[in-house]
């Protein structure tokens, strides 16, 4: 290092402590980066890479950004998952002896960003800390530095279960200790796409003990300690806004795994990963940013305590029934800014005068809000606002201290109102009267000299001056002025009197700016005292905002208040999928009932593709979620139990575990439901078993249905294309067949989207293929094959038998179900095979099958089709292969 210049040596010494971060090294008006940081930053930020002499034989790579634009560049890096260490000059270069002293003042990371475009106003920005214990358990602590919120929970179960809970927090960064295994770290980085940070200290930092008074469990304290130590080490500033730690237990809320949340599109859509089109999008009528964040938190964790849900529902009903109260509340909420994040900025020291003005405007609305709610005859409302302080003294303080239109910077003056500070008023008087004197002096000198163009000006280098054009110099009295500066077309002068006033004016203006800054920082410290009260107010207002949002959307969309029952029964009359109905935008939506008495556990749903089976299933899940977060539901009448968990397998879900086939993911999700569901759970399985052969799929589907029916007893909607399974209604007394109806008109299928009792009579798969505009020749061939397959006389369905756990496997005895044969074309297959395998039977039929005559080329094409593995092909690849084979047949 001795070969480098002192400044580069200083850089390398600081960089050694921040190897995993970009080091923004302050040099005058720029933040500079050197060596590998410079090369990488130039690429990521698309800025010019240069070099400089650093004392060694080779020039050092270098790039930099202006200090006034650094915020934007830092946000870009953090958005990409990087960390940025900000190293400032901490002494005046004019008084420094040798190299200016520099220190890192903040480490900015994805989990500690306080503001900027990466921070969504209606989403939390949680930093997570995960601690692993020898008994296999984990403690998960989370902190949102922007709001001061802290939570902690103890987790048990598989590593995948732990990862799913971590994923549910939405954290972009996770803090672990150095003992975490490489496999664990890979799952966090590759599976959850999180930035990894390390912290081994677990003792609660001095000064933060009061935040964990309600936490006694050693494991939880370790996780919180790790989190707090990391925050203190990286932020290096006041954390007065941190709130007491809230302990939560996952069994206090309805469990919805990540796959199910995605399938149901609770907070984002499957296709675009955006809020628009999700349930959150529909329900979010909140007027405040903090209300929007609370709404999302409620949706992530629906309640399972019936009494708490009913309290929310009653409050929503109050708002629904009182239009004027609700509208008045909404108007006031529009004027309330983000109290939580404003409090965080006050504590952090980066609050400006405009922020404090927003705080005052928000507080002005609070007394009326609290008074209106206090008049309600509602125990929940009374308890909600209990202890809420409107902070009227703070409102008064801000009202008499902050100007109405202050600048963004707190170092340019013009922040503090007249009358707030006597000394400031005196300086302003001197400055104002001094400038008045200057104007009077200018008029007087014009009169004395007779030069009408004479003017008095000011610049920072020369101060105040009298300027006269060269054409008028002869008119000036001899010896009246002292020459100060010569310009091309004018001369500038000074007088003793003007010098004296200049000193007074400039001193006053300089003192004004400094005094205003001092007064503002003192004011900020006074506001800090109110942070706990502001945070309590924020929670009250957020909750009221969410409840009015529920009431607003419930009235607009004609939702109904659900009745919660302790019985295991579902009664939904004219239920609708709330988002689909909204997206249809006034077009006719077909409502459907879902009536499952206490002794009815399984609906086996059949019907054609595109008929609405999946929508019906999602509809029930969304109604359940809406009910248990305290919102009215899309129906004309609804009686619902309180579910403890929702399990879904609907559509193609992403594989968080990574690298698994679609069928494997399907089986893992089925296993998750079977292993964890209770009779208080809701299970939605769509087409289980489709990812394997017909026989395997049908066998698995039947076994899963029987297990849920006999062993779990959970309310279950199970859709299937295996129409043969509908005979299970005869042997499973708590299973009922329902179907989505369709009719044929003029050779075309019309989907009615109506759920009716009984099994579907047809699949209409070929009609769907026609709608997709597959070639006519292919459709015709499919109809021929279908007719042949439907001609099979016998369908083998395994008889249901009792199978005890850990006993020898029992092979079910086949049951023969007779069907009427369908007339087919008489033809002879001219191939080497003498008979065709039965599609439904387990063996070849003894009865000789009718065959369709095929030529040699057609036989070869069929052989190729048999070899195609459709599960390993994309839809586009499948269509291309189909086109190739069709082209080959046409040539023949």
Curated annotation (Swiss-Prot):
NCBIfam families tied to this protein: mutS1, PRK05399.1
Gene: mutS
Organism: Bacillus cereus (strain G9842)
Record's keyword terms, sorted: ATP-binding, DNA damage, DNA repair, DNA-binding, Nucleotide-binding
Binding positions (ATP): 607-614
The organism's place on the tree of life at top rank: Bacteria
Entry protein name: DNA mismatch repair protein MutS
InterPro entries: DNA_mismatch_repair_MutS, DNA_mismatch_repair_MutS-lik_N, DNA_mismatch_repair_MutS/MSH, DNA_mismatch_repair_MutS_C, DNA_mismatch_repair_MutS_clamp, DNA_mismatch_repair_MutS_core, DNA_mismatch_repair_MutS_N, DNA_mismatch_repair_MutS_sf
GO terms assigned for molecular function: ATP binding; ATP-dependent DNA damage sensor activity; damaged DNA binding; mismatched DNA binding
CDD domains: ABC_MutS1
Alphabetical list of SMART domains matching this protein: MUTSac, MUTSd
One Pfam match: MutS_III
PANTHER family: DNA MISMATCH REPAIR PROTEIN MSH1, MITOCHONDRIAL (PTHR11361:SF34), DNA MISMATCH REPAIR PROTEIN MUTS FAMILY MEMBER (PTHR11361)
GO biological process, one term: mismatch repair
Family recorded in the similarity comment: Belongs to the DNA mismatch repair MutS family.
Any one of the GO CC terms: cytosol
Entry function: This protein is involved in the repair of mismatches in DNA. It is possible that it carries out the mismatch recognition step. This protein has a weak ATPase activity.
């Amino acid at each position: 290092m001795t070969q480098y210049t002192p400044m580069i040596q200083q850089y390398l010494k600081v960089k050694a402590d921040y190897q995993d971060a970009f080091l923004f090294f302050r040099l005058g008006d720029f933040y500079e980066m050197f060596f590998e940081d410079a090369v990488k930053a130039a690429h990521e930020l698309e800025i010019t890479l240069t070099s400089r002499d650093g004392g060694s034989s080779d020039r050092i790579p270098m790039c930099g950004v202006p200090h006034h634009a650094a915020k934007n560049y830092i946000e870009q890096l953090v958005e990409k998952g990087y960390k940025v260490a900000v190293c400032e000059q901490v002494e005046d270069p004019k008084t420094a002896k040798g190299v200016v002293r520099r220190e890192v003042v903040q480490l900015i990371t994805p989990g500690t960003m306080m503001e900027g475009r990466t921070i969504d106003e209606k989403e939390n920005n949680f930093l997570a800390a995960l601690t692993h214990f020898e008994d296999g358990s984990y403690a998960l602590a989370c902190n949102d530095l922007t709001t001061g919120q802290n939570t902690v929970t103890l987790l048990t179960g598989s590593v995948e279960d732990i990862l799913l809970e971590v994923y549910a927090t939405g954290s972009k960064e996770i803090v672990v200790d150095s003992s975490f295994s490489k496999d664990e770290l890979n799952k966090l980085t590759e599976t959850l796409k999180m930035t990894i940070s390390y912290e081994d200290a677990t003792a609660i930092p001095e000064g933060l003990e009061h935040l964990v008074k309600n936490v006694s469990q050693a494991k939880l304290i370790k996780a919180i300690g790790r989190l707090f130590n990391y925050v203190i080490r990286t932020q290096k500033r006041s954390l007065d806004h941190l709130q007491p730690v809230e302990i939560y237990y996952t069994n206090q809320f309805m469990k919805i795994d990540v796959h199910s949340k995605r399938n149901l599109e609770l907070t984002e859509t499957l296709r675009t990963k955006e809020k628009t089109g999700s349930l959150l999008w529909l329900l979010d009528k909140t007027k405040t940013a903090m209300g929007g964040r609370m709404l999302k938190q409620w949706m992530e964790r629906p309640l399972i305590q019936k009494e708490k849900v009913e309290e929310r529902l009653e409050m929503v009903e109050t708002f629904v029934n009182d239009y004027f109260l609700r509208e008045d509340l909404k108007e006031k909420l529009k004027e309330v800014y983000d109290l939580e994040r404003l409090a965080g900025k006050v504590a952090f020291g980066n609050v400006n005068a405009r922020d404090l003005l927003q705080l005052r405007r928000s507080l002005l609305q609070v007394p009326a809000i609290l008074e209106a709610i206090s008049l309600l005859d509602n125990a929940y409302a009374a308890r909600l606002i209990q202890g809420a302080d409107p902070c009227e003294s703070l409102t008064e303080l801000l009202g008499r201290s902050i100007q109405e239109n202050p600048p963004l910077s707190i170092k340019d003056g013009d922040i503090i109102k007249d009358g707030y500070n006597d000394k400031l008023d005196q300086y302003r008087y001197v400055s104002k009267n001094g400038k008045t004197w200057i104007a009077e002096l200018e008029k007087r000198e014009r009169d004395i000299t007779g030069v009408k163009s004479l003017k008095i000006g000011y610049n920072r280098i020369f101060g105040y001056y009298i300027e006269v054009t060269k054409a008028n110099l002869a008119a000036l009295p001899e010896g009246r002025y002292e020459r100060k500066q010569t310009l091309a077309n004018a001369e500038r002068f000074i007088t003793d009197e003007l010098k004296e006033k200049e000193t007074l004016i400039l001193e006053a203006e300089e003192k004004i700016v400094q005094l205003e800054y001092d007064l503002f920082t003192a004011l900020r410290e006074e506001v800090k005292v109110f942070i706990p009260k502001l945070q309590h107010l924020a929670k009250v207002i957020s909750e009221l905002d969410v409840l009015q949002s529920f009431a607003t959307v419930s009235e607009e969309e004609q939702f109904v208040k659900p009745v919660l029952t302790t019985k295991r029964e579902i009664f939904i009359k004219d239920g609708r999928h709330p988002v689909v109905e909204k997206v249809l935008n006034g077009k006719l939506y077909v409502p459907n009932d879902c009536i499952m008495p206490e002794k009815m556990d399984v609906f086996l749903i059949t019907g054609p593709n595109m008929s609405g089976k999946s929508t019906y299933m999602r509809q029930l899940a969304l109604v359940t979620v809406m009910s248990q977060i305290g919102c009215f539901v899309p129906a004309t009448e609804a009686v619902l139990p309180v579910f403890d968990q929702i399990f879904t397998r609907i559509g193609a879900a992403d594989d968080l575990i990574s690298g698994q086939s679609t069928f494997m993911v399907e089986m893992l999700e089925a296993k998750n439901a079977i292993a964890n569901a209770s009779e208080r759970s809701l299970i939605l399985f769509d087409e289980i078993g489709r990812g394997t052969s017909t026989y395997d799929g049908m066998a698995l589907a039947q076994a899963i249905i029987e297990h849920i029916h006999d062993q779990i007893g959970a309310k279950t909607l199970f859709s299937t294309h295996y129409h043969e399974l509908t005979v299970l209604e005869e042997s499973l007394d708590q299973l009922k067949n329902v179907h989505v109806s369709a009719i044929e008109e003029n050779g075309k299928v019309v989907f009615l989207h109506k759920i009716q009792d009984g099994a579907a009579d047809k699949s209409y798969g070929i009609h769907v293929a026609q709608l997709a505009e597959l070639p006519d020749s292919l459709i015709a061939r499919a109809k021929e094959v279908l007719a042949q397959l439907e001609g099979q006389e016998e369908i083998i369905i395994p008889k249901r038998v009792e199978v005890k756990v850990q006993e020898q496997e029992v092979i079910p005895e086949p049951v023969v179900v007779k069907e009427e044969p369908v007339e087919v074309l008489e033809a002879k297959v001219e191939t080497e095979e003498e008979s065709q395998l039965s599609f439904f039977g387990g063996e070849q039929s003894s009865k000789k099958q009718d065959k369709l005559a095929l030529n040699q080329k057609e036989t070869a094409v069929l052989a190729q089709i048999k070899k195609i593995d459709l599960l390993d092909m994309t839809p586009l690849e499948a269509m291309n292969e189909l086109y190739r084979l069709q082209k080959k047949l046409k040539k023949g």
